[in-house]
Swiss-Prot record:
Organism encoding this protein: Mus musculus
Comp. bias intervals (Basic and acidic residues): 321-386, 1321-1336
Coiled-coil segments on the chain, per record: 1585-1640
Gene Ontology process terms (BP): proteolysis; spermatid development; spermatogenesis
Calpain catalytic domain sequence ranges: 70-402
Official protein name in the record: Androglobin
Subcellular location: Cell projection, Cilium, Flagellum
Family membership noted in the UniProt record: In the central section; belongs to the globin family.
Knockout-associated phenotype: Adgb knockout males display infertility, reduced testis weight, impaired maturation of elongating spermatids, abnormal sperm shape and ultrastructural defects in microtubule and mitochondrial organization. Females display no fertility issues. Epididymal sperm display multiple flagellar malformations including coiled, bifid or shortened flagella, and erratic acrosomal development. The spermatids are not able to move to the lumen and enter the epididymis to undergo further maturation. A high rate of apoptotic events might further aggravate the decrease of sperm.
Length: 1657
């Protein structure tokens, strides 16, 4: 059963994993084996399998039972213990292994156990000899951190309550170990005497099963080199550490600098994802805000109790006493329990007792933090690991509770996070001076807080604080009488009073077991600050005068050993005094009072806490472990640490995606991601990379470079090949995570993962996302985005609100305003654009309403709509047939008047129209006014329309907004959802199947015409397993190809055309056999409808016609010319390939010798599709094809039509002809042509257009030179072809053109002449020879191929080429391809006609040529009587015939395929010709070297050989050589000197040096001229800039002067206005005074009058 489970589990492994035969390790059995004995490490081993509880339950833990252990321990079956098949672990270099022992070899007191104490453990005190190793410090620190995170609060409550029952701990480190137990919750591993243990750790994206043995390393002093607890017989730390070290050995790090790379033990123990954030001085403020969000925050209560103060001081005093007492830091941190009371009194944080109680020590650090304001340096080398389990928990909950960790309440709770921080060791051999500076600053600051830079280790960041630890005492209330007209104190001084900025309270609490380890913290005074002191100068005691407040310059004197009480008190006083001195007016006497009061209070507290110093350390450190806490100023925190890590719990996120791949290939794996949200998006992306396997993790100088794994994320859009932005880039050797933050909306991301061995990707988010292959993700981009849907529904609901309140007088104006705000959210500040926007909205709404009315709309439908939108001209100026986008672009155009009207008529028409329009507008206004009859009618009509729309509100809303977006109005860009249009897409797939293909074959996979219904951007993508597949897209109207980048078609704007676009896919199999499979073309566009096929289904059966021949160089550089005629119009693909892969060729299609289309290629050239118009016969049965031929005859029309039909695949199955199938000369063809002449004449009488197409290929840039072997082969090939042609055309009868289309094109037609008797007698022999030599060896071959199977083996040493014509299988019978020999046949027939009409013409021409040559030929002088020079007659005749032959051949040199040979081709003729070839070639080289300074290329030699006449070949080569020796070339030689000089090597060198000197002088002169030009240009630019600057300064000066004048004017004006105002006020006051005086006088006078009257009475 175990073996079956092992085989089943092996699915997750990689059998081809890398491994290395590591060096032998020390293997010591107690004292029985000498230290020098070694054991070879095991070889390759598979990657650790994924965790499976079924495998653990079926595991065999003893020896020899089951095949699993036998396979793994195949080394020595005689041992009765388990030995790790992966070999011994590799310890860091700081730990020297001397021997390996099993637990039975060094534990004698009792039987070893895996777990002894399940409540507490001590990994610090027993392992001080291991703390020199960075790896061991990390393991110990991170085990403590995870223990504190999960179990800190539970154990604190347990020890405080002294409960009898043991608490249930959420996490136990020994539960990662399995031995002799089942995989159940809460299992306890047992000691296994066999030595086999299984450890469960998280690695490469999942939990892994890691098997270890119980061999433990020891050094020479017999010290265990793995962490252990205080119980020496407890094994779980050693076993767990061995598995962790296995993971560390896979990681990559630099030897002699670090002992571990990017591995994090917390990630291995918990599976949480580490996010790396470097601390850079530029954005430390953002880091503080992030930490404040994540970490629990320490807060002060309004009234802290005195009991909490006493308890806090108690703990701090004890801590300080213990630190001075002994250096055993392992026990110093265990006295943190009683400090919980202070926390309870301050925060009311229930679950954080254990953590808050540690504030006693942290307050001590706080006193030191107060006076430190160090500058922040750039930090990059230290790593910070942040564990903030608290992302969404309330700030009152300070303790990490497992309950909050384990719960993931969907979208209500935010993810849990934990903050961690580390610093790297001090490396003195660092080459970068900036790194050394950072290390020095960090080491100095760490020492102030009791940490050592040498002992690098991770620290846990637990809390943040933005307030003092102890709340300052409140000032006594001021008496009410002092609050009346309270004046600020006046300070008499002549110095400027500068406000001292107050440093913000920013502190972080860290927890570390290495705090104050073997060192005493101290503070280095680096800055000064002002401390206010109250000094009464010149005043006697008891004086009531206010004292003077001065600032004395005092250095920071707070010491690390200072009591935390004094530190807190001084901190509180300073903060209070600064506040009072700067902001609040207060009397100095109050400050004195507060200071004295605080001092007396502190003395009382100290006296109260001294009694607690006698308590034992055990009572104060109940199960708090060795971890201690301290508060750090955030500014100092940024100096000490360079990176922070935030560990995210993945299960606290709503959505998780995980994918792992192990492939030993260096290729990037793409992942597409879709996300859409109405709120900002956060994606947590974790990437794990395995860059190598089975090798040591340390990198030395001799190690090969190892590239890290790479994960990139790009925001892409299918409309562009360039990504919009790179949003993420992760380089790692182990595991790293990062948060991708995206704005609200829809996004398309492309992840590319690269790792040599394997990788794992993990994506978490609280927002819904889809990630995977393109087929999985693309369908999510078809629906409208969330923002688009929301915007459309808002608009539609606003329309419904208007319709519902159309009869309500009070609500209708508000509803109309809401509708305008919905569809016109942002003012455009452009009247024309705003008017266009409203018109677009009204037309879109009209189209939607009209479309929604399935039944007959109401009679007043249009009137009701106009009343609602209040637009009378809209529907009249808009045509229903015109698209909205076209209507937007159109401007109002004046109508064309067919006749001219008089001014009176125009005025009358305008008056009538204005009257009717005014009446209609008044009617609309009345309909919009509630409580009118018209309004009720319109409202009822609108209600009926809305009832239809409301049934499918969302669909109609999307249609409305989509209509508006299709208008392409610029105002649509103001909508927020417009940004989502970049990712809006629709796609359609078209698939075909292809058959099996042999190696090195080319074939067509797909060829179809697509019709584009509307202008849109389209991206075609090909999905296939073919090694090479290229897609071509051709516009059938213009015959232009859509541009490609790296052989891929780019997104392109496809405009609507008449003949559509042809999509052609060509493929090449390469060196391997390709089996048949499915090929898919995907068209991606913005919206439907997408381009569609011109027929129902695509064609996948094609016929390939192959033509092979050899390259024969010629003067015109023509590779070949073939004429092609099609009976039925069809599309054909043309491909040419050459044997020389770097030859530049140009493939052309000619119609009537005019280039219709062409393409240039290197080694091959392809015309993807060309539509050939057919010459259909009168009795053609292809009636369906005749429709396609009914096109006009002008030349341009066939050209355009060619492109349209090229999309329809046309295949051809040719009738293969053996031998001379491509040679269209000979008697059989002539006879057939003679029989067909009457038919052609009948056809020519019809008005049908006859199309003549030529396929021509040219060699460019002389890019196909031939070597000697190839030249010899080509020469022999030409000679044999000449013999064949001579045999076929030996008779003097004239020959007409073998091609029937030559007659139909109107060229000169040659009749059949009367043949001579000799020709008639030799006709029978000719037919016989034609049958015998039907297929010469070097004859080009024409092969009909259903597929691209080669008919003969290709010889790469011969210059051959292949022409392929691909048509649809059904149309292949209607294609005829022939070699184009029309011009050669015409020349040959012309010569024959001349000879027939004028006999002896050839002889006369030969005599004339002889006469010309005799002028330059001298008779050779020779004494040899046996050998005589040729007679003049013989030589003249031969040379005249040679000249005649050359004249004819020069005319035909354009067509190198037509050649002539002598009539008597005997067996020895070929040998003679080969000899003559060598002779004339050497002669040509010699002659050209003397006459022409530049030697002609080898291609020029070949026509000379071909132009020799048969008469010369019959002459002896010696005679020709002697005759040519006496040729007079003197008049061809150009003399440049008076006397001839011998051309020697010295002369050549001298001339070369002169030439080089001239070139050098010219180059110097040229460079001088160019430099002068550059200088002049720079001066001109400089002068131009100076002129612009001068005018700019003049403008600025004028503006400044104008502004000064205006300012002076304004001041003067204000002064006058002020004076006028004062004068008016004075006058008003004067008048008021006068009036008062008058009023005072008038009552007095009245009273006096009354008194007088009374007296009179």
């Amino acid at each position: 059963m175990a073996s079956k489970q092992a085989k089943r589990k092996e699915v997750h492994r990689i059998n081809s994993a890398h491994g290395s035969d590591k060096s032998k390790d020390l293997y010591h059995f107690g004292s029985n084996v000498p230290p020098g004995s070694f054991e070879q490490k095991k070889g390759k081993f598979p990657i650790w399998p994924e965790w499976s509880e079924a495998d653990i339950n079926a595991e065999k833990w003893d020896a020899g039972k089951g095949g699993k252990e036998k396979d793994k321990t195949a080394k020595s079956p005689i041992f009765h213990f388990f030995e790790d098949p992966e070999g011994k672990i590799e310890l860091p270099q700081s730990l020297k292994v001397f021997s390996w022992k099993r637990p039975q070899d060094f534990i004698f007191s009792r039987t070893p156990v895996v777990v002894k104490n399940e409540i507490t453990f001590d990994l610090f005190s027993p392992n001080e000899h291991l703390l020199c190793s960075e790896l061991m410090r990390w393991i110990i620190s991170e085990i403590y951190a995870v223990w504190k995170i999960f179990n800190g609060g539970i154990l604190s409550n347990y020890h405080k309550g002294n409960l009898g029952e043991l608490p249930i701990l959420p996490w136990k480190p020994w539960e990662h170990i399995y031995s002799l137990c089942k995989a159940v919750k809460g299992h306890v591993p047992l000691f296994n005497s066999y030595g086999k243990y299984v450890v469960k750790l998280y690695w490469m994206g999942c939990w892994r099963k890691i098997t270890v043995d119980d061999f433990l390393p020891f050094d020479e002093e017999n010290n265990l080199l793995l962490p252990a607890t205080s119980y020496e017989f407890e094994l779980w730390p050693m076993l767990l550490s061995k598995a962790i070290i296995k993971l560390a050995n896979v990681d990559v790090h630099v030897a002699h600098r670090r002992e571990l790379g990017e591995l994090t033990v917390i990630h291995a123990l918990t599976g949480w994802l580490p996010e790396v954030i470097p601390l850079h001085p530029a954005y430390v403020d953002r880091v503080w805000e992030l930490l404040k969000e994540i970490l629990p925050e320490f807060k002060l209560t309004e009234e802290p109790s005195s009991e909490s103060k006493i308890t806090t001081i108690d703990n701090k005093l004890k801590e300080a006493t213990k630190e001075n007492k002994d250096g055993k830091d392992g026990k110093n941190g265990k006295d943190l329990k009683d400090g919980k009371d202070m926390k309870d009194g301050k925060d009311g944080k229930d679950g954080k007792d254990g953590k808050d109680g540690k504030d006693g020590k942290d307050e001590k650090a706080d006193a030191r933090d107060l006076g430190k304001k160090n500058k922040k340096d750039g930090e990059k080398e230290k790593e910070k690991f942040k564990f903030s389990l608290h992302g969404s928990r309330p700030s009152s909950d300070v303790q990490y509770s497992m309950q909050s960790l384990s719960e993931c309440s969907s979208a209500i709770q935010l993810p849990h996070m934990v903050v961690y921080a580390t610093f790297t060791p001090l490396y003195l051999f660092e080459n970068k001076i900036f790194s050394l500076e950072k290390m020095a600053n960090s080491a100095e600051k760490l020492r102030e807080y009791g940490l050592s830079h040498i002992c690098s280790h991770p620290v846990l960041v637990t809390r943040s604080r933005s307030c003092p630890l102890v709340s300052p005492p409140k000032p006594p209330p001021l008496p009410a009488w002092k609050l009346i007209r309270h004046k600020k104190e006046t300070v008499i001084t002549d110095e400027a009073q500068d406000a001292v900025p107050k440093k913000p309270e920013q502190f972080l609490e860290i927890s570390s077991p290495f705090l104050n380890y073997r060192m005493t913290p101290f503070t280095i005074p680096t800055e000064t600050h002002f401390v206010q002191s109250v000094i009464k100068k010149g005043t006697p005691l008891g004086s009531s005068l206010p004292p003077l407040v001065e600032n004395d310059l005092v250095a920071s004197t707070s010491q690390g050993e200072m009591s935390i009480v004094n530190g807190n008190q001084s901190q509180g006083n300073i903060a209070l005094q600064i506040t009072l001195g700067k902001d609040e007016p207060s009397e100095p006497a109050l400050a004195d009072f507060h200071q004295l009061e605080a001092t007396s209070l502190d003395r009382d507290l100290i006296s109260l806490t001294t009694a607690t110093l006698d308590k034992s350390q055990e009572e104060l450190a109940i199960n708090e472990g060795v971890a201690k806490e301290i508060w750090l100023d955030f500014e100092d925190f940024c100096v000490c640490f360079h990176h922070i890590y935030i560990f995210h719990k993945p299960h606290s996120y709503c959505l998780n995606f995980q994918k792992s791949e192990f492939k030993f290939v260096e290729e990037r794996v793409p992942y597409y991601l879709f996300v859409d949200s109405l709120k900002p998006i956060e994606l947590l992306v974790c990437f794990s990379a395995l860059v190598r396997w089975g090798e040591s993790g340390a990198l030395t100088k001799d190690s090969p470079p190892v590239e890290p794994g790479l994960l990139t994320a790009e925001a892409i859009t299918w409309k562009s090949l360039k990504p919009l932005s790179v949003v993420l880039r992760i380089h790692t050797y182990a595991t790293k995570a990062s948060v991708v933050r995206l704005p609200a909306g829809r996004h398309m991301l492309l992840f590319n993962a690269y790792s040599p061995v394997g990788h794992a990707i993990h994506v978490c988010s609280m927002t819904t996302f889809v990630i995977g292959d393109e087929d999985i993700v693309l369908p999510n981009f078809e629906p409208e985005s969330y923002r688009f849907t929301e915007q459309s529904i808002i608009i539609m609901k606003a329309i419904g609100n208007v319709i519902a309140n159309f009869k309500d007088k009070g609500k209708l104006p508000a509803a109309l305003r809401d509708l305008q705000a919905a569809h016109y959210p942002i003012p455009l500040n452009n009247k024309e654009l705003t008017a266009q926007h409203f018109r677009v909205f009204h037309i879109s709404l009209w189209r939607l309403m009209k479309k929604s009315q399935v039944a007959k709309p109401p009679s007043n439908f249009k009137f009701a709509f106009r009343a609602m939108v209040f637009d009378t001209d809209l529907l009249d100026s808009f045509s229903e047939d015109v698209s909205l986008a076209e209507w937007v672009d159109l401007k109002y155009s004046t109508p064309i008047n067919e006749k001219e009207y008089t001014s009176e008529e125009i005025a009358a028409a305008v008056k009538i129209q204005s009257m009717w329009k005014g009446c209609y507008v008044r009617l609309l206004m009345k309909a919009r006014k509630p409580e009118t009859k018209e309004n009720v009618t319109v409202a009822d009509t609108l209600q009926k329309i809305w009832a239809v729309l409301e049934m499918n509100l969302e669909q109609y809303a999307l249609s409305l907004l989509r209509l508006m977006f299709k208008s392409k109005c610029k105002s649509m860009e103001s909508y927020p959802c417009y940004q989502d249009e970049e990712t809006k897409l629709a796609f359609a797939d078209h698939t075909v199947n292809y058959a099996d293909q042999p190696p090195n074959s080319w074939f067509i996979v797909f060829r179809e015409i697509f019709l584009v219904p509307q202008d849109m951007i389209i991206l075609p993508k090909v999905y296939t397993t073919l090694p090479i597949c290229i897609l071509h897209v051709i516009n059938n109207d213009t015959l232009e190809q859509v541009p490609k980048v790296f052989q891929k078609v780019v997104p392109f704007l496809y405009t609507k055309n008449k003949k559509g676009y042809t999509f052609v896919a060509e493929a090449y199999t390469g060196d391997t056999f390709v089996s048949g499979a499915r090929w898919k073309l995907r068209l991606i566009g913005s919206y439907n409808p997408l381009p569609f096929l011109a027929r129902d289904s695509p064609c996948n059966t094609f016929s390939i016609k192959e033509i092979r021949d050899y390259y024969i160089p010629n003067d015109r550089k023509i590779l070949f010319r073939y004429s092609i005629k099609v009976t039925v119009a069809q599309s054909i693909t043309i491909q040419v390939r050459t044997s020389k892969p770097d030859t530049f060729i140009k493939l052309q299609v000619l119609e009537s010798e005019e280039v219709i289309t062409s393409t240039v290629g290197k080694g091959q050239a392809v015309i993807p599709a060309f539509y050939f118009l057919g010459n259909e016969k009168a009795l053609s049965s292809q009636s369906s094809k005749q429709v396609l031929l009914s096109h006009p005859s002008p030349k341009k029309d066939p050209e355009v039509l060619t492109k349209k039909k090229s999309g329809q695949p046309g295949q051809k199955s040719f009738k293969g002809r053996s031998g001379g199938g491509l040679t269209d000369t000979g008697m059989p063809l002539l006879e057939e042509e003679i029989l067909n002449i009457p038919t052609l004449e009948e056809n020519s009488s019809t008005p049908q257009q006859c199309y003549k197409y030529i396929i021509q290929c040219l060699v460019l840039f002389n890019s196909w030179p031939l070597n000697e072997t190839q030249l010899t082969f080509v020469q022999a090939l030409k000679d044999m072809e000449k013999m064949d042609i001579k045999e076929k055309h030996e008779e003097p009868a004239p020959m007409g053109s073998p091609d029937s289309h030559a007659v139909s094109e109107g060229q000169k037609s040659v009749g059949v002449p009367k043949t001579t008797r000799k020709g008639k007698e030799k006709s029978a022999e000719k037919e016989k020879l034609a049958k015998e030599k039907q297929a010469p060896r070097f004859e080009p071959q024409q092969v009909q191929m259903p597929t691209a199977v080669h008919s003969q083996q290709e010889d790469p040493n011969k210059p051959y080429w292949i022409l392929r014509l691909v048509s649809e299988h059904t149309d292949s019978d209607y294609v005829d391809v022939k070699k184009d020999t029309e011009r050669a046949d015409e020349i040959r027939a012309m010569k024959q006609a001349w000879e027939t009409t004028e006999p002896g013409r050839a002889i006369k021409a030969a005599q004339a040529r002889l006469k010309y040559l005799t002028q330059f030929i001298k008779k050779p002088v020779t004494t040899d009587t046996t050998t005589s020079a040729p007679s003049p007659e013989t030589l003249s005749v031969s040379q005249s015939q040679t000249k005649s032959s050359e004249e004819g051949e020069l005319d035909t040199g354009k067509y190198a395929d037509i050649k002539e040979l002598p009539p008597n081709a005997a067996g020895s003729v070929l040998w003679k010709k080969w000899q003559m070839t060598k002779t004339i070639t050497s002669l040509t080289k010699f002659t050209s070297s003397e006459s022409v300074p530049k030697e002609e290329p080898p291609q020029k030699e070949i026509p000379v050989v071909r132009q020799r006449s048969p008469t010369i070949l019959e002459t002896s080569p010696q005679q020709i050589r002697k005759a040519l020796e006496f040729l007079d070339f003197s008049h061809y030689v150009r003399k440049t000197a008076a006397e001839a000089v011998l051309q020697t090597e010295e002369l050549n060198k001298q001339q070369a040096m002169q030439k080089a000197e001239e070139i050098h002088q010219f180059r110097q002169h040229r460079s001088r001229i160019l430099s002068i030009r550059d200088i002049d240009q720079e001066e001109r630019f400089k002068q131009k800039d100076e002129v612009l600057e001068m005018y700019g300064e003049m403008r600025d000066s004028v503006d400044e002067a104008r502004q000064k004048i205006l300012d002076i004017r304004e001041v003067y004006r204000n002064k006058l206005l002020e004076a006028e105002r004062l004068r008016m006020e004075a006058l008003a006051a004067q008048e008021a005074a006068v009036k008062i005086e008058i009023e005072k006088k008038s009552p007095a006078s009245d009273s006096q009058k009354k008194k007088k009257v009374g007296k009179k009475k």
